[in-house]
Design a protein with these regions (language model features):
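Flexible "cap/lid" subdomain of the alpha/beta-hydrolase fold that forms the substrate-access gate
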Residues: 2-25, 32-35, 39-42, 70, ...
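Active-site glycine-rich loops that stabilize anionic/oxyanionic intermediates
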Residues: 40, 48-51
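Structural cue for short, hydrophobic secondary-structure segments
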Residues: 45-48, 71
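Serine-hydrolase catalytic-loop signature spanning alpha/beta hydrolases and amidase-signature enzymes
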Residues: 50-58, 69
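Alpha-helical elements of the RecA-like P-loop NTPase motor core of helicases
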Residues: 54-57, 220, 297
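A short, Lys/Arg-enriched amphipathic alpha-helix followed by its capping loop at the start of a domain
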Residues: 58-67, 107
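Catalytic histidine-centered segment of alpha/beta-hydrolase-like enzymes
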Residues: 283-296
Length: 304
């Protein structure tokens, strides 16, 4: 059921200079928190797990010198709504998340835009580019191989390094209760295990991630995101197996991270997109936090 759309100004961002926080009531029924700043062509940047839109705090101000930069919190994450799920996990499918993003850009009167997604955000971006090829002009995916590919090639090393892919998909409330017992520990373990440049996540940023993560509704929503990835998202991908991303796709990944070590990243995406290029940066899973200068250099060169 569609809902009347609206925008509410929350005030200046505490984390990203010259950006404004806003809430958008989308036609999908979701109230989405996002930050916006800058002028120029539209550019959307979407976080992954276990983050929120503030993961872009080191790169967004410079991108905003050339673009109107939109930084949403995905449904289930941050200060965006966490809708009730269903047995098939459809509300947390990448298809539904992509609808939210298109609805937001429609509300902002930005029918076309470039897209940068990290982690789960890039998985939403994959679906976004397939379902709305007329809207996405260019795409950057950060530190992922395709979901179906990663599941199909699962081995001991991947299952050990990315254990949460298999932990979070267990039936509720098993993972929810275990994480909820000590979300601070779980979040520290997760982030510290993926970054390779220590100190890149300031205490203030970590505490903001934790503020959101310790909400039981967030924990459940995150589990549903992963449950969807292991079920209905794979069904959607299988149904669209003959479709490819039409816009130019650029890939960045951390040379010291799991994805870069286990996969031919560009090769995996050549099966999914028409035009693919990419390269590694000397970091772990989160280039935008670990090596923002290198990230900006590569992304701006591609977008320009």
């Amino acid at each position: 059921m569609e809902t009347e759309s609206s925008l509410v100004n929350i005030g200046p961002s505490e984390f990203i200079d010259s950006f404004t926080l806003m809430d958008a009531r989308l036609e999908t029924g979701i109230k989405m928190r996002f930050a916006i700043g800058g002028n120029g062509p539209a550019l959307m940047l979407v976080h992954g797990h276990p983050h929120t839109h503030i993961i872009w705090r080191k790169v967004a101000p410079l991108l905003a010198q050339k673009y109107t930069v939109v930084l949403p919190d995905l449904r289930g994450y941050g200060d965006t709504d966490k809708p009730e799920s269903t047995p098939d996990h459809r509300p947390y499918s990448k298809k539904e998340m992509a609808k939210d993003l298109i609805s937001l850009m429609k509300l902002l009167n930005r029918p076309t835009f470039a897209f940068v997604g990290h982690d789960r955000g890039a998985r939403v971006g994959h679906r976004l580019a397939l379902d709305y090829p007329e809207s996405v002009t260019k795409a950057v995916f950060v530190d992922i191989a395709p979901t179906a590919t990663m599941y199909a090639l699962t081995n001991k090393e991947f299952a050990t390094k990315y254990f949460w892919w298999f932990f979070l998909i267990q039936p509720e409330p098993f993972p929810e209760k275990l994480i909820g017992f000590d979300p601070d520990y779980f979040l520290h373990h997760h982030i510290d295990g993926q970054i390779k440049i220590k100190g890149c996540v300031e205490d203030k940023a970590f505490n903001e991630y934790l503020r959101c993560y310790k909400d039981p509704r967030t924990i459940h929503a995150i589990c549903e995101d992963y449950r969807a990835a292991a079920t209905i998202d794979l069904d959607d991908d299988k149904e669209d197996a003959d479709k490819k991303i039409q816009c130019p796709l650029y890939l960045l990944w951390g040379a010291r991270g799991t994805v870069g070590k286990l996969y031919d990243v560009v090769g995996t995406w050549k099966e999914k997109a028409v035009t693919v290029s990419g390269e590694a940066l000397d970091c772990g899973h989160s280039p935008e936090e670990e090596c923002p200068s290198g990230f900006l250099e590569k992304v701006l060169a591609f977008l320009d």
